[in-house]
Amino acid sequence: MAFNNEKTTWMDPDTNTAYALSAFNSFVTTYEIKPDKEGEPFSVPVRVIFSNHCYSRERKEEQANQIIDTQHRRDGTTEERVFCQKRWKFCQDLPMIIENLGLQKCFSGDRDIIYRQEQKSGVAAQDGWYICMRLDYREKKGPAFELWVRSVHWRRNRPVDIRNHGGQKFRQLLSQFAKKKGVFEP
């Protein structure tokens, strides 16, 4: 693994090209929600956390020196991850995309998963980068709301678990999630 000690940079061991990973630092942002239709909207802080799947992919034919992470799956198998320059390049704008997510159309999936489609190709409506995120709420943690950016993928079709094909604004999905968790006021 060719990370520096703080994992702020990854160095390609074959080309010695350095890739900054600062775009994947956790941060806190704020979104406006309205869980109660009769209530007033209010802002909630949300911690944003990035998985290394935002800049890596499953190993195929790459040399062992390209492996950046080994992950054990629930089914007992092991997945080796390698750096993905295409994902890394797309994700350089990811913090800004997440900051401005509130009024953007997103799709809900299973188990509190939310998808955002970016950079549509213009050829087919479903082509584009899909950002896969999961909402979490932990009342005793500060901030209580978390948005875990699980991965990004270029796809020609939508993920199979998308339920609302027309999509909703992110803040509406976050409001529904807050209501489900019993959060009706700041």
Task: List where the protein language model places each region.
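Ribonuclease/tRNase effector modules and their secretory precursors
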Residues: 1-186
